[in-house]
UniProtKB/Swiss-Prot annotation:
Cofactor(s) listed in the protein's UniProt record: pyruvate
Annotated organism of origin: Actinobacillus pleuropneumoniae serotype 5b (strain L20)
BP GO terms, sorted: phosphatidylethanolamine biosynthetic process
Protein name: Phosphatidylserine decarboxylase proenzyme
Functional pathway: Phospholipid metabolism; phosphatidylethanolamine biosynthesis; phosphatidylethanolamine from CDP-diacylglycerol: step 2/2
Catalysed reaction, written as an equation: a 1,2-diacyl-sn-glycero-3-phospho-L-serine + H(+) = a 1,2-diacyl-sn-glycero-3-phosphoethanolamine + CO2
Marked site: Cleavage (non-hydrolytic): 262-263
Lineage: Bacteria, Pseudomonadati, Pseudomonadota, Gammaproteobacteria, Pasteurellales
Post-translational modification: Is synthesized initially as an inactive proenzyme. Formation of the active enzyme involves a self-maturation process in which the active site pyruvoyl group is generated from an internal serine residue via an autocatalytic post-translational modification. Two non-identical subunits are generated from the proenzyme in this reaction, and the pyruvate is formed at the N-terminus of the alpha chain, which is derived from the carboxyl end of the proenzyme.
Cofactor binding: number and manner: Binds 1 pyruvoyl group covalently per subunit.
Residues recorded with modification Pyruvic acid (Ser): 263
Amino acid sequence: MSLKPYATPTYWQRVKVAFQYIFPQLPVTRLAGWLAEQKWGAVTHFIIRTFAKQYKVNLSEAQKSNASDYATFNEFFIRPLKENARPINQDAQALCLPADGKVSESGKIEDDRLLQAKGHFFTLETLLANDQEMANKFKDGHFITTYLSPRDYHRVHMPCDATLRKMIYVPGELFSVNPFLAEHVPNLFARNERVICEFETEFGPMVQILVGATITASMSTVWAGIINPPRTKEVVEYHYETSGETAVHLKKGQEMGAFRLGSTVINLFPKDSVEFEAHLQAGVETRMGERLAKIVK
Protein backbone atom coordinates (compact mmCIF):
# COMPACT_ATOMS: atom_id res chain seq x y z
CA MET A 1 0.00 0.00 0.00
CA SER A 2 1.67 3.18 -1.14
CA LEU A 3 1.38 6.15 1.19
CA LYS A 4 1.04 9.58 -0.38
CA PRO A 5 1.95 12.86 1.27
CA TYR A 6 -1.00 14.51 2.97
CA ALA A 7 -1.60 18.05 1.72
CA THR A 8 -3.18 20.64 4.00
CA PRO A 9 -6.53 21.63 2.45
CA THR A 10 -6.97 25.16 1.15
CA TYR A 11 -9.61 27.52 2.50
CA TRP A 12 -12.05 26.76 -0.33
CA GLN A 13 -11.45 23.04 0.03
CA ARG A 14 -12.36 23.31 3.72
CA VAL A 15 -15.51 25.22 2.76
CA LYS A 16 -16.43 22.50 0.26
CA VAL A 17 -15.98 19.80 2.89
CA ALA A 18 -17.90 21.76 5.54
CA PHE A 19 -20.81 22.12 3.13
CA GLN A 20 -21.10 18.32 2.98
CA TYR A 21 -21.75 18.23 6.72
CA ILE A 22 -24.65 20.71 6.57
CA PHE A 23 -26.09 19.62 3.23
CA PRO A 24 -29.56 18.00 3.63
CA GLN A 25 -28.36 14.65 2.28
CA LEU A 26 -31.41 12.48 2.91
CA PRO A 27 -34.16 14.89 1.73
CA VAL A 28 -32.21 15.68 -1.45
CA THR A 29 -31.54 11.98 -2.07
CA ARG A 30 -35.22 11.14 -1.59
CA LEU A 31 -36.22 13.93 -3.97
CA ALA A 32 -33.68 12.76 -6.55
CA GLY A 33 -35.01 9.21 -6.28
CA TRP A 34 -38.59 10.39 -6.81
CA LEU A 35 -37.66 12.58 -9.78
CA ALA A 36 -35.66 9.76 -11.38
CA GLU A 37 -38.75 7.52 -11.39
CA GLN A 38 -41.10 10.01 -13.07
CA LYS A 39 -42.35 9.35 -16.61
CA TRP A 40 -42.39 12.79 -18.19
CA GLY A 41 -42.03 11.82 -21.82
CA ALA A 42 -40.17 14.45 -23.84
CA VAL A 43 -38.96 16.18 -20.66
CA THR A 44 -37.39 12.95 -19.41
CA HIS A 45 -35.79 12.36 -22.81
CA PHE A 46 -34.36 15.90 -22.83
CA ILE A 47 -32.89 15.39 -19.34
CA ILE A 48 -31.30 12.10 -20.41
CA ARG A 49 -29.81 13.63 -23.57
CA THR A 50 -28.45 16.58 -21.59
CA PHE A 51 -26.97 14.30 -18.92
CA ALA A 52 -25.42 11.99 -21.53
CA LYS A 53 -23.84 14.95 -23.32
CA GLN A 54 -22.60 16.61 -20.14
CA TYR A 55 -20.96 13.45 -18.77
CA LYS A 56 -19.98 11.93 -22.15
CA VAL A 57 -22.02 8.77 -21.61
CA ASN A 58 -21.41 6.19 -24.35
CA LEU A 59 -24.98 5.19 -25.21
CA SER A 60 -23.86 3.27 -28.29
CA GLU A 61 -22.83 0.33 -26.10
CA ALA A 62 -26.22 0.18 -24.33
CA GLN A 63 -29.00 -2.17 -25.42
CA LYS A 64 -31.15 0.94 -25.87
CA SER A 65 -28.97 3.53 -27.58
CA ASN A 66 -31.48 6.39 -27.90
CA ALA A 67 -32.59 8.66 -25.06
CA SER A 68 -36.20 8.34 -26.23
CA ASP A 69 -36.06 4.58 -25.55
CA TYR A 70 -36.12 5.17 -21.77
CA ALA A 71 -39.31 5.84 -19.83
CA THR A 72 -37.53 7.16 -16.71
CA PHE A 73 -34.13 8.53 -15.79
CA ASN A 74 -33.50 5.54 -13.52
CA GLU A 75 -34.16 3.17 -16.40
CA PHE A 76 -31.46 5.01 -18.34
CA PHE A 77 -29.08 5.10 -15.41
CA ILE A 78 -29.09 1.33 -14.82
CA ARG A 79 -29.13 0.62 -18.56
CA PRO A 80 -27.94 -2.89 -19.50
CA LEU A 81 -25.17 -3.13 -22.08
CA LYS A 82 -25.16 -4.98 -25.37
CA GLU A 83 -24.01 -8.58 -25.29
CA ASN A 84 -20.19 -8.81 -25.29
CA ALA A 85 -19.79 -5.08 -24.61
CA ARG A 86 -17.76 -6.18 -21.58
CA PRO A 87 -15.97 -9.48 -22.33
CA ILE A 88 -15.26 -11.46 -19.16
CA ASN A 89 -11.67 -12.62 -18.62
CA GLN A 90 -11.78 -16.38 -19.17
CA ASP A 91 -8.66 -17.38 -17.20
CA ALA A 92 -9.91 -19.81 -14.53
CA GLN A 93 -7.24 -18.54 -12.11
CA ALA A 94 -8.10 -14.86 -12.63
CA LEU A 95 -10.58 -12.55 -10.94
CA CYS A 96 -12.30 -9.89 -13.03
CA LEU A 97 -13.08 -6.28 -12.21
CA PRO A 98 -16.61 -5.89 -10.79
CA ALA A 99 -17.48 -2.48 -12.24
CA ASP A 100 -16.67 0.31 -14.66
CA GLY A 101 -15.08 3.30 -12.96
CA LYS A 102 -11.74 4.30 -11.47
CA VAL A 103 -9.61 2.78 -8.75
CA SER A 104 -10.00 4.97 -5.69
CA GLU A 105 -7.41 2.97 -3.73
CA SER A 106 -6.13 -0.60 -3.67
CA GLY A 107 -3.51 -2.63 -1.88
CA LYS A 108 -2.75 -4.57 1.25
CA ILE A 109 -4.85 -4.37 4.39
CA GLU A 110 -2.34 -3.49 7.11
CA ASP A 111 -3.58 -5.66 9.99
CA ASP A 112 -7.13 -4.25 9.98
CA ARG A 113 -6.51 -0.86 8.34
CA LEU A 114 -7.46 0.12 4.79
CA LEU A 115 -6.25 3.22 2.98
CA GLN A 116 -9.17 5.49 2.06
CA ALA A 117 -7.13 8.24 0.40
CA LYS A 118 -4.16 10.48 1.13
CA GLY A 119 -3.52 10.35 4.87
CA HIS A 120 -6.85 8.73 5.75
CA PHE A 121 -7.38 5.17 6.95
CA PHE A 122 -10.39 3.26 8.22
CA THR A 123 -10.71 -0.15 9.86
CA LEU A 124 -12.25 -3.41 8.75
CA GLU A 125 -14.39 -3.51 11.87
CA THR A 126 -16.00 -0.12 11.25
CA LEU A 127 -16.47 -0.85 7.54
CA LEU A 128 -18.12 -4.21 8.32
CA ALA A 129 -20.61 -2.83 10.85
CA ASN A 130 -18.61 -4.07 13.87
CA ASP A 131 -18.82 -7.69 12.69
CA GLN A 132 -15.55 -8.79 14.30
CA GLU A 133 -15.82 -12.37 13.06
CA MET A 134 -16.06 -11.19 9.46
CA ALA A 135 -13.33 -8.58 9.95
CA ASN A 136 -10.88 -11.20 11.25
CA LYS A 137 -11.15 -13.11 7.97
CA PHE A 138 -9.60 -10.21 6.04
CA LYS A 139 -6.80 -9.01 8.33
CA ASP A 140 -3.61 -8.56 6.31
CA GLY A 141 -5.59 -9.33 3.17
CA HIS A 142 -6.14 -7.16 0.10
CA PHE A 143 -8.75 -4.61 -0.95
CA ILE A 144 -9.74 -2.56 -3.95
CA THR A 145 -12.11 0.41 -3.95
CA THR A 146 -13.77 1.35 -7.26
CA TYR A 147 -15.44 4.74 -7.73
CA LEU A 148 -18.29 4.87 -10.26
CA SER A 149 -18.73 8.34 -11.75
CA PRO A 150 -22.03 9.59 -13.22
CA ARG A 151 -20.96 8.58 -16.74
CA ASP A 152 -20.22 4.96 -15.87
CA TYR A 153 -22.22 1.76 -16.32
CA HIS A 154 -23.85 1.30 -12.90
CA ARG A 155 -24.46 -2.43 -12.66
CA VAL A 156 -22.05 -4.37 -10.47
CA HIS A 157 -20.81 -7.87 -11.33
CA MET A 158 -19.05 -10.77 -9.64
CA PRO A 159 -15.24 -10.99 -9.76
CA CYS A 160 -15.38 -14.79 -9.43
CA ASP A 161 -17.70 -17.76 -8.93
CA ALA A 162 -19.16 -17.49 -5.43
CA THR A 163 -21.97 -18.50 -3.09
CA LEU A 164 -23.73 -15.91 -0.92
CA ARG A 165 -23.44 -16.39 2.86
CA LYS A 166 -24.61 -13.13 4.37
CA MET A 167 -25.91 -9.68 3.48
CA ILE A 168 -25.88 -6.74 5.88
CA TYR A 169 -27.70 -3.45 5.33
CA VAL A 170 -25.95 -0.67 7.24
CA PRO A 171 -27.73 2.69 7.61
CA GLY A 172 -25.48 5.72 7.53
CA GLU A 173 -24.62 9.09 6.10
CA LEU A 174 -24.92 9.98 2.43
CA PHE A 175 -21.73 11.94 1.83
CA SER A 176 -20.59 12.27 -1.74
CA VAL A 177 -17.89 9.66 -2.46
CA ASN A 178 -15.97 11.47 -5.20
CA PRO A 179 -12.15 11.42 -4.95
CA PHE A 180 -11.98 14.91 -3.43
CA LEU A 181 -14.28 14.01 -0.53
CA ALA A 182 -12.51 10.67 -0.07
CA GLU A 183 -9.36 12.69 0.63
CA HIS A 184 -11.01 15.03 3.13
CA VAL A 185 -13.83 13.25 5.00
CA PRO A 186 -12.43 10.81 7.59
CA ASN A 187 -13.92 7.28 7.65
CA LEU A 188 -16.06 8.15 4.63
CA PHE A 189 -16.85 4.60 3.48
CA ALA A 190 -17.39 3.37 7.05
CA ARG A 191 -19.83 6.24 7.71
CA ASN A 192 -21.97 6.05 4.58
CA GLU A 193 -24.98 3.83 4.02
CA ARG A 194 -23.90 0.49 2.53
CA VAL A 195 -24.81 -3.09 1.68
CA ILE A 196 -22.21 -5.70 2.68
CA CYS A 197 -22.30 -9.02 0.82
CA GLU A 198 -20.17 -11.92 2.07
CA PHE A 199 -19.51 -14.84 -0.26
CA GLU A 200 -17.77 -18.22 -0.18
CA THR A 201 -15.29 -18.85 -3.01
CA GLU A 202 -12.71 -21.46 -3.94
CA PHE A 203 -9.99 -19.33 -2.29
CA GLY A 204 -11.92 -18.52 0.89
CA PRO A 205 -14.30 -15.71 1.90
CA MET A 206 -14.79 -12.63 -0.28
CA VAL A 207 -16.74 -9.47 0.47
CA GLN A 208 -18.27 -7.05 -2.02
CA ILE A 209 -19.70 -3.84 -0.58
CA LEU A 210 -22.04 -1.38 -2.30
CA VAL A 211 -21.52 2.06 -0.74
CA GLY A 212 -24.26 4.67 -1.00
CA ALA A 213 -23.76 8.41 -1.51
CA THR A 214 -25.60 11.69 -1.99
CA ILE A 215 -28.38 11.21 -4.56
CA THR A 216 -27.84 7.41 -4.57
CA ALA A 217 -31.56 6.87 -4.19
CA SER A 218 -31.32 3.09 -3.95
CA MET A 219 -29.11 0.03 -4.14
CA SER A 220 -30.28 -3.39 -5.25
CA THR A 221 -29.08 -6.98 -5.55
CA VAL A 222 -30.23 -9.66 -7.97
CA TRP A 223 -31.36 -11.95 -5.13
CA ALA A 224 -33.16 -9.45 -2.89
CA GLY A 225 -34.24 -6.67 -5.26
CA ILE A 226 -34.18 -3.07 -3.99
CA ILE A 227 -32.57 -2.94 -0.54
CA ASN A 228 -33.28 0.72 0.15
CA PRO A 229 -35.67 2.44 0.38
CA PRO A 230 -37.16 1.92 2.85
CA ARG A 231 -34.25 3.07 4.98
CA THR A 232 -34.04 1.77 8.54
CA LYS A 233 -32.14 3.15 11.52
CA GLU A 234 -30.85 -0.28 12.52
CA VAL A 235 -28.32 -2.65 10.97
CA VAL A 236 -30.20 -5.53 9.33
CA GLU A 237 -28.57 -8.93 8.66
CA TYR A 238 -29.74 -11.58 6.22
CA HIS A 239 -28.28 -15.10 6.31
CA TYR A 240 -28.40 -17.53 3.39
CA GLU A 241 -28.06 -21.27 2.98
CA THR A 242 -24.96 -22.17 0.97
CA SER A 243 -26.42 -25.39 -0.44
CA GLY A 244 -29.82 -26.64 -1.54
CA GLU A 245 -32.57 -25.06 -3.60
CA THR A 246 -32.48 -21.69 -1.83
CA ALA A 247 -28.72 -21.15 -2.14
CA VAL A 248 -27.57 -18.14 -4.18
CA HIS A 249 -24.78 -19.21 -6.55
CA LEU A 250 -23.30 -16.56 -8.84
CA LYS A 251 -20.84 -16.99 -11.69
CA LYS A 252 -17.81 -14.85 -12.50
CA GLY A 253 -18.97 -11.82 -14.48
CA GLN A 254 -22.62 -12.30 -13.53
CA GLU A 255 -24.54 -9.23 -12.39
CA MET A 256 -25.01 -9.04 -8.62
CA GLY A 257 -26.36 -5.56 -8.00
CA ALA A 258 -26.88 -1.99 -9.18
CA PHE A 259 -26.82 1.65 -8.06
CA ARG A 260 -29.58 4.09 -8.92
CA LEU A 261 -27.11 7.00 -9.04
CA GLY A 262 -23.69 6.88 -7.37
CA SER A 263 -21.31 5.35 -6.07
CA THR A 264 -18.51 3.03 -4.84
CA VAL A 265 -17.73 -0.70 -4.67
CA ILE A 266 -15.24 -2.16 -2.17
CA ASN A 267 -13.86 -5.70 -2.48
CA LEU A 268 -12.06 -7.56 0.32
CA PHE A 269 -9.93 -10.68 -0.09
CA PRO A 270 -8.21 -12.80 2.59
CA LYS A 271 -4.50 -12.93 3.30
CA ASP A 272 -2.31 -14.67 0.71
CA SER A 273 -5.26 -15.48 -1.56
CA VAL A 274 -4.83 -13.15 -4.56
CA GLU A 275 -2.26 -11.01 -6.35
CA PHE A 276 -3.61 -7.80 -7.91
CA GLU A 277 -2.61 -6.65 -11.37
CA ALA A 278 0.29 -4.23 -10.83
CA HIS A 279 -1.25 -1.39 -12.86
CA LEU A 280 -4.41 -1.14 -10.73
CA GLN A 281 -3.32 1.91 -8.75
CA ALA A 282 -5.34 4.93 -7.62
CA GLY A 283 -6.80 6.84 -10.56
CA VAL A 284 -6.61 4.00 -13.09
CA GLU A 285 -9.79 3.46 -15.11
CA THR A 286 -11.51 0.09 -14.76
CA ARG A 287 -13.77 -1.85 -17.10
CA MET A 288 -15.98 -4.57 -15.77
CA GLY A 289 -14.77 -8.03 -16.83
CA GLU A 290 -11.10 -7.16 -17.30
CA ARG A 291 -8.47 -8.89 -15.19
CA LEU A 292 -8.31 -7.82 -11.54
CA ALA A 293 -6.07 -10.39 -9.89
CA LYS A 294 -4.62 -13.88 -9.94
CA ILE A 295 -5.77 -16.52 -7.45
CA VAL A 296 -2.70 -17.78 -5.59
CA LYS A 297 -4.25 -19.76 -2.73
